Amino acid sequence: MQGAQEASASEMLPLLLPLLWAGALAQERRFQLEGPESLTVQEGLCVLVPCRLPTTLPASYYGYGYWFLEGADVPVATNDPDEEVQEETRGRFHLLWDPRRKNCSLSIRDARRRDNAAYFFRLKSKWMKYGYTSSKLSVRVMALTHRPNISIPGTLESGHPSNLTCSVPWVCEQGTPPIFSWMSAAPTSLGPRTTQSSVLTITPRPQDHSTNLTCQVTFPGAGVTMERTIQLNVSYAPQKVAISIFQGNSAAFKILQNTSSLPVLEGQALRLLCDADGNPPAHLSWFQGFPALNATPISNTGVLELPQVGSAEEGDFTCRAQHPLGSLQISLSLFVHWKPEGRAGGVLGAVWGASITTLVFLCVCFIFRVKTRRKKAAQPVQNTDDVNPVMVSGSRGHQHQFQTGIVSDHPAEAGPISEDEQELHYAVLHFHKVQPQEPKVTDTEYSEIKIHK
């Protein structure tokens, strides 16, 4: 009889197990999660899935909490030390378990696109005949749209160091610290950093103006990288000043060296254009000559118009580039070439006139010298008795002594000469050496000697 009872019990056990399981399932109680039915988070960031234990749960209830991905048997987070969690969520999903405060929230950090799913919470106890299962909540993971912020205190000035800060204030502190990277052509050095910011010390140069500076932030927990690029606005004094020259309709050419020379034809139109670098732009002005600091410019712009170049424009012109951080200037020397029909023709005529005058003077001297020699060769020896000295006073106060002599070309027995008839005689003139005096009004004196017999 006893054996028959044992046999009947063993045969009925398979039939009783489904009933026992059904009773256990009947003891599973459900509760509603508080808050929205779905949450949105950007990849690389953090999100908190709120969960609150049911108020009907006895204070003496002790068990373990489990968060599950819908359709999965392995939890994504739990406080049960004997339970394994999914590899994909290990270290990123955490159960914030606090039975006293009824807290069963799920913390997700370093969110990834694969985390996009529905989740639910289950509460189980090994000593209780029933458990609790929450309603489902959907988590949507979107692409990261936030970008780093770059802040610059004040103005970047050439040669002066400044601290630039790259920050990501939207990053959660519980996540994996991001990696900051800086890219710039300017001289830089890294400063202090936190989980949400990085400081870069930069000493810009004039050539760094308008160049790019990039801050790149990588989130290693999610494998996402974001960056921001700005253009540097560097203040610097002028480094180069150049003059572009326009002569009439000819093409422009540029002068970069100081005190350069430029030949210009008289009457030609000239346009000088001054250009300088510097940031902010320098104030350009033109001066004639080499100006002092407080000199008055002839043009308050970078353009100097000379519509007709003449003698007044010959000389130096200076362009000055004034800047709060320093000034620079460049000078240009103009040399005026005169037109051939103008001054050049007059000079040529003067040369020809002087040449002709000299030639005529030499011819006169030559003729006078030849005549003088012929007269001396034809003059006979004179009798001293027939020489009569004649004194002539000049207007300059000098006395000249003249000796006259009768020279006969025929014998004495020639026919008599009338008293009234004038005879031609020769005179020998002796000029005493006169000391040179200042030139005065020229007087011409004539002497006529007549001898009557």
Curated annotation (Swiss-Prot):
Cite the binding residues for N-acetylneuraminate.
R122
Disulfide bond residue pairs: C46-C172, C51-C104, C166-C215, C274-C319
Report the residue ranges where the short sequence motif ITIM motif is annotated in this entry.
424-429
Source taxon at top rank:
Eukaryota
Q: Where is the Ig-like V-type domain?
A: 28-123
Signal sequence, renumbered to the chain: 1-26
Recorded hits in InterPro entries, A to Z, give: Ig-like_dom, Ig-like_dom_sf, Ig-like_fold, Ig/MHC_CS, Ig_I-set, Ig_sub, Ig_sub2, Ig_V-set
Cytoplasmic topological intervals: 369-453
> Could you say which tissues express the protein in this record?
Expressed at high levels in placenta (cyto- and syncytiotrophoblastic cells) and at lower levels in spleen, peripheral blood leukocytes (predominantly B-cells) and small intestine.
Give GO BP annotations, semicolon-separated: cell adhesion; cell-cell signaling
Where, by residue number, is the motif SLAM-like motif?
444-449
A molecular function GO annotation:
carbohydrate binding
Question: Is Nucleotide-binding one of the keywords?
Answer: no
Explain the purpose of this protein.
Putative adhesion molecule that mediates sialic-acid dependent binding to cells. Binds to alpha-2,6-linked sialic acid. The sialic acid recognition site may be masked by cis interactions with sialic acids on the same cell surface.
Domains: what does the record tell us? Contains 1 copy of a cytoplasmic motif that is referred to as the immunoreceptor tyrosine-based inhibitor motif (ITIM). This motif is involved in modulation of cellular responses. The phosphorylated ITIM motif can bind the SH2 domain of several SH2-containing phosphatases.
Protein name, per record: Sialic acid-binding Ig-like lectin 6
Its lineage reads: Eukaryota, Metazoa, Chordata, Craniata, Vertebrata
